[in-house]
């Protein structure tokens, strides 16, 4: 059986990052955009853990900080989405114009 190497992890992380980036660029629903950002952050975590396999455990420690940041970003983002929905009754990015007078 073949060993799963670092390159395999990096390829999976690159695919996750590309899928997340395409989701952020193409979607108009705020919830889907937040999920795509979480996918990008998970790709970053996978890269950090893969490189910590080669260069020590610092990548794993930093990955924990990225997860904490992602949780805080999700909480704040969902709070903003709820505020948007209460004001405009939509979560579509194109229809939300709270900064316009």
From Swiss-Prot:
GO molecular function annotations of the record: NADH:ubiquinone reductase (non-electrogenic) activity; quinone binding
Cellular location(s): Cell inner membrane
Membrane topology label: Multi-pass membrane protein
NCBIfam families: PRK05715.1-2, PRK05715.1-3, PRK05715.1-5
Key words of the record: Cell inner membrane, Cell membrane, Membrane, NAD, Quinone, Translocase, Transmembrane, Transmembrane helix, Transport, Ubiquinone
Functional description taken from the UniProt entry: NDH-1 shuttles electrons from NADH, via FMN and iron-sulfur (Fe-S) centers, to quinones in the respiratory chain. The immediate electron acceptor for the enzyme in this species is believed to be ubiquinone. Couples the redox reaction to proton translocation (for every two electrons transferred, four hydrogen ions are translocated across the cytoplasmic membrane), and thus conserves the redox energy in a proton gradient.
GO cellular component, as recorded: NADH dehydrogenase complex; plasma membrane
PANTHER family membership: NADH-UBIQUINONE OXIDOREDUCTASE CHAIN 4L (PTHR11434:SF16), NADH-UBIQUINONE OXIDOREDUCTASE SUBUNIT ND4L (PTHR11434)
Any GO BP: ATP synthesis coupled electron transport
Designated name of the protein: NADH-quinone oxidoreductase subunit K 1
Assembly: NDH-1 is composed of 14 different subunits. Subunits NuoA, H, J, K, L, M, N constitute the membrane sector of the complex.
Signal peptide positions (record): none
Parts of the chain that traverse the membrane: 4-24, 31-51, 64-84
Domain of life where this protein originates: Bacteria
Protein family per UniProt: Belongs to the complex I subunit 4L family.
Enzyme Commission number(s): 7.1.1.-
Gene: nuoK1
Known catalytic reactions: a quinone + NADH + 5 H(+)(in) = a quinol + NAD(+) + 4 H(+)(out)
């Amino acid at each position: 059986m073949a060993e799963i190497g670092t390159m395999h992890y990096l390829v999976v992380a690159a695919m996750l990052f590309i899928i997340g980036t395409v989701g952020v660029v193409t979607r108009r629903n705020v919830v889907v955009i937040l999920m795509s950002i979480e996918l990008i952050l998970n790709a970053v975590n996978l890269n950090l853990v893969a490189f910590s396999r080669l260069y020590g455990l610092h990548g794993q420690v930093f990955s924990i900080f990225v997860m904490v940041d992602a949780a805080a970003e999700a909480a704040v983002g969902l709070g903003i989405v709820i505020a948007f929905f209460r004001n405009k009754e939509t979560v579509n990015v194109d229809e939300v114009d709270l900064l316009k007078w």
